[in-house]
Each structure stands twice: as C-alpha cells, then as structure tokens.
From Swiss-Prot:
A single GO BP: regulation of transcription by RNA polymerase II
Chief place where the protein resides: nucleus
Region (Disordered) residue spans: 104-124, 495-521, 564-602
SUPFAM superfamilies: Homeodomain-like
DNA-binding region (UniProt annotation): 544-564
Gene encoding the protein: LCORL
Cross-link (Glycyl lysine isopeptide (Lys-Gly) (interchain with G-Cter in SUMO2)) at residue(s): K242, K319, K340, K397
A Pfam family matched in the record: HTH_psq
Residue ranges of every copy of the HTH psq-type domain listed in the record: 516-568
Protein name: Ligand-dependent nuclear receptor corepressor-like protein
Superkingdom of this protein's organism: Eukaryota
Keyword terms, alphabetized: Activator, DNA-binding, Isopeptide bond, Nucleus, Transcription, Transcription regulation, Ubl conjugation
Amino acid sequence: MDKGRERMAAAAAAAAAAAAAAQCRSPRCAAERRGFRRELDSWRHRLMHCVGFESILEGLYGPRLRRDLSLFEDCEPEELTDWSMDEKCSFCNLQREAVSDCIPSLDSSQSTPTEELSSQGQSNTDKIECQAENYLNALFRKKDLPQNCDPNIPLVAQELMKKMIRQFAIEYISKSGKTQENRNGSIGPSIVCKSIQMNQAENSLQEEQEGPLDLTVNRMQEQNTQQGDGVLDLSTKKTSIKSEESSICDPSSENSVAGRLHRNREDYVERSAEFADGLLSKALKDIQSGALDINKAGILYGIPQKTLLLHLEALPAGKPASFKNKTRDFHDSYSYKDSKETCAVLQKVALWARAQAERTEKSKLNLLETSEIKFPTASTYLHQLTLQKMVTQFKEKNESLQYETSNPTVQLKIPQLRVSSVSKSQPDGSGLLDVMYQVSKTSSVLEGSALQKLKNILPKQNKIECSGPVTHSSVDSYFLHGDLSPLCLNSKNGTVDGTSENTEDGLDRKDSKQPRKKRGRYRQYDHEIMEEAIAMVMSGKMSVSKAQGIYGVPHSTLEYKVKERSGTLKTPPKKKLRLPDTGLYNMTDSGTGSCKNSSKPV
C-alpha cells in the first residue's frame, strides 16, 4: 500500500511539473518553443540537404518501405471498394490534376492579355516540372529502381508517394537552381516557380477555376522575363530612365528638386570647408610641433593624409593650400578691400614720418654734439599715439577676418606663464613706451617740461620715473636691451618700472604695488588658438566644451571671452581710459591739458 501511494504521489508530482512547464511563460521558454517550431517548419529542406534525395528514394522504394508496410497488412482490406478516381474525397489533389489538365482545352478560345501573362508563369512551372521528371528518371536509371511501386501498397498510398516524391524533386531542383544562379550572379525562374507552387498548394480547385488571376506573380514574371538569363544589371540606367520620364511629365518638379539639391550641396560644402579649415590648422600645428605624426593627426582630425602632406609641403614655400569655395572668395575680396584702406593709411603715416625725419636731420647733429637725449613734446607724442592706434585698429580688423579664412602657418608656441606688474591693460602702456622711444630718436631738442605732461597722460599704474641726462655709455647699454626703451631699464620680475635716485616728483611705491602672481594654468595657452576657438564658438559651429577639447584652451577663459565679446556678461569690465581719435594733424597741446585734468593729480 505504501509503495502504491508513493507511486501515485510521484505521478501526481510529475503531472504537476508537466502542467507547470506547459504554463511557463518565461521569455527563455518562449524562445525555445519558437525555435522548435521553426525547425519543424523547415523539416523538408533539412531532410533533403542532410539525408539526401537519393537516400530518401531508396528508403521509399527500397526493401525498407516494404518491410515497414508489411506490418499493416491485416489493417486494410484486400479490395478497395470505396475508392474511385471520379469521386471527391480528402485526397483532392488527384482530382485537381485531372481537372487542371482539361482547363486549357476549355478556355483556349477565350484568351486575354492577363491570361497571356499567366501563361508565361505556367510555362516556367512546366519547365521546372519537366526538369523534375527528367531528374527522377535519371535517378531511377542510376539506382536501377522500378518506377512503379509494389502492388501490395494501396493505391492511395502509391499516389501520395508519387506526389510527395514529385514535390520533393521540384523543390530540390528549384533550390539548387537558385543557389547556382546566386553563384553565377544571374536571376532565374526559381523565385517565380516557388511562388507559383505555393499559390497552387494554397488555392483550392474552385479558386483556380473561378477566382481572379494573381497579378503579383505576373509582375515578378515580367521582371524576370525582361532580365532573362543574362548577367544581373547593377547600373543606374533604369533609375535614370525613370527620372527622365518623370522630368518630361513634370518639369517644374525637376527644377525645384534640382535647386534644392544644389542648395544642400552648397551648404554642405561651405560647412565642411569651414570645419576643415579650423581642424586643418590645428592638425598642421600639432604635426609641426611634433605632438602628433601624420597618421595620428589624420585619424584624430578625420583629414586624409594626402591633404595633410599637401598642406605641409605648401607651408615652407609660403603658400598655404586652402579649400576652394565661395565663402573663401567672399572673405578674400573683403580682406582685400580692407588691405587697400590700410595701405592708404600707412602711406599717410609714411609721408608724415618722412616730413618728421627731414625736420629732425638738423637736430640729430645737435644730439650728437650735446650727448643728451631729451623727451619730445606732448603734441608730437600724441600725433604718434594716434597713428599707432589707427594702424593697430586696421590690423585687428584684418586679423579678425583672416583667422577664420586662412590657415595659420606659424608653429605652435609653447605657452609660458606671464608675470607682469600691471593688469590686463599693460599692452597699451608698453605701446606708449615704444612710441616714446621711437619719437625720442627722431624728435628735435625741446623743452624739459614735456616730461611732466607725459607723466600726467600715462595711466597711474604705468607711470614711469626716469633719470636726468643720459650719456653715450648708458645709451649703448639701452640698445643692448631690445625689449626696453631708454625711458627706463629695470628688468626686475620682467616689469617696466624704472626708478632712480633722482626722481623729480617722488611717486610713492604703494601706488605702483604689484598684484600677486597668478597660479595654476592661468594664461598658459596660445593666443592665436584661443582666437580661433572664440571665432568657432561665436559663429555657432562648436560649443565651448567641444572647442576646449579640440583646441586645448581653458574652459572658463574661453567662456568668459565669448560672453565678453557677445555682451552677455553679468558684470562687464570697466571701460579703459582711451584718447580721442580726432585725426592726424589737429592734435594740439590743449588736448594734453584735457587728458591731464582727467587723470589723477600726482
């Protein structure tokens, strides 16, 4: 009893497990079930390719089939009284063949264009059926097998076996023909035959007799009959013919499409050239500095190596290669106009300098005799300052246009930490010193009160204390220092702060207090690369982060400069003290008085 109960419990557990497995809805089980279904659906093709068609025929017509059928001898009657060829039964394929053989003779008188197209498809199926019959006959002769089955096999089974073998042969030939055509690059009637066979298997007898024709098969047949058995045509002749026909039908649509394609192509060329200009200049700088070789630069920036080699060969010759596009022509013409204006101003400057040189020829002789260098008047200094400002403004204009359109040919400079005693307005002060140095060499011997006026004109942080008379030995020592003017020579910490014992106005050292040194990576970048990055960000071609990654400049500095130039800073910087640009020759001593009043008293 106990054993029986245990067996019943085990059977119940197995049934429960089977039910649970049947009700399992996990994706893994569902995927496995789908895989099994696919394998069952493709059993015929697997059977033919794995087992082989000849072995299947041997199994069907050989002694194995007779041995298997001998097991069912007692199950069926000896005489078949319930079968006749004219009766309808579940094996209607036999009757469909008999009826379909009569259909062409009945409908031969009534033929339409659609029937002609369908007849082409039927001719292809007839070809495949003939090939299958020939293949079967060849196999039977090769294997020495009788084409007729054993008389002990029932008639229904014989007919089914014949149908099955015939279907196998058709599928085998169509599939083998398809693989051969794929290897040869040609398209044959295998696809059409397969579709026709599927349609014949799915449609019933009434649908074949009364239903409409399947036009999809006819379309496929038309394409295949047009292509024929030749090589597959991969050219664009058909598409060009279609486009020509559509353009003949609708010329307005052709014009609109052509214009749209032309605009898109122009925009793409402009954008790609602009992007390529910026990246190309950066790549050339990296290659020249030795940071990257040509292969790595081409991979990193996406520029072909031939293009990089072409530009590198053009750089030493002084002719940087550039992309040809419409935007470049526009920028070149614009910069050419500005260069004309700059040349005109520079010619005026040259005439003025020549006149000054002629005036000061006599004063130079007096300078050599007295061995003294004295400062010019404030009016001549302001003339020179105005000219310098005008020239620098035109230079900035040209540079702002050229750094977008031209590729910089200079090598990448290693950024250095700049330590100076003045704030960001230091370049103006150094420019003033250079101007004073140039004017002092060519100006006449004038009154000593100009020194007081010049000190009042200069900004407070750039005030300079100078000594009295300068001898020939001190002049020689001045010329040894290329960066400093004879006004002052004190290279402590790289600052321009010349102090001497004989100070005339006794400025406090607290007024010229130096700011603290900047720490970290402050200003450790190339200014030309920074200008290029600012231009790319302001034009909307790159974001700040992308420009930082490509050009290698500080993120905060780049963001600040972009906001400063676009005028979106929350707290804009204070305006610098600028001298009015009133012209070349109408600056007088009265202007110095106004500047003096505007500055703080000494």
